[in-house]
Curated annotation (Swiss-Prot):
PANTHER family: RIBOSOMAL PROTEIN S19P FAMILY MEMBER (PTHR11880), SMALL RIBOSOMAL SUBUNIT PROTEIN US19M (PTHR11880:SF8). It comes from Mesomycoplasma hyopneumoniae (strain 7448). This is Small ribosomal subunit protein uS19. Keywords: Ribonucleoprotein, Ribosomal protein, RNA-binding, rRNA-binding. Belongs to the universal ribosomal protein uS19 family. The lineage of its organism: Bacteria, Bacillati, Mycoplasmatota, Mycoplasmoidales, Metamycoplasmataceae. The gene is rpsS. GO terms for cellular component: cytoplasm; small ribosomal subunit. One of its GO terms (biological process) is translation. Protein S19 forms a complex with S13 that binds strongly to the 16S ribosomal RNA. SUPFAM superfamilies: Ribosomal protein S19 (SSF54570). GO terms for molecular function: rRNA binding; structural constituent of ribosome. Signal peptide: none annotated. PROSITE patterns: RIBOSOMAL_S19. It holds the Pfam family Ribosomal_S19.
Length: 90
């Protein structure tokens, strides 16, 4: 279910502060965050985030196509090892 339009998009305050500081300093340093639930705003375009996936931090470079999505969508939490292989054959 989508978020109500009258509520507007969500982003954690501490993340917005870090983004504003990075833009003000014109910093290229990645912004480390655990906030997978935050929506990507247009001001995030061109910045690099280190998004936690529960184990490590994945580097996410934000482009125009990502605006409106969540940061967590670009840092997968599960590892796919493929479907079962035939272990009995040697």
């Amino acid at each position: 279910m989508a978020r109500s339009l009258k509520k507007g998009p969500f982003a954690d305050d501490h993340l917005l502060k870090k983004v504003d500081e990075a833009i003000a300093k014109n910093s290229r340093k990645p912004i480390k965050t655990w906030s997978r639930r935050s929506t990507i705003f247009p001001q995030f375009v061109g910045l690099t985030f280190l998004v936690h996936n529960g184990k490590i931090f994945n580097e996410v470079y934000v482009t125009d196509d990502m605006v409106g999505h969540k940061l967590g969508e670009f840092s997968p939490t599960r590892t796919y090892h493929g479907h079962g292989k035939d272990k009995a054959k040697k």
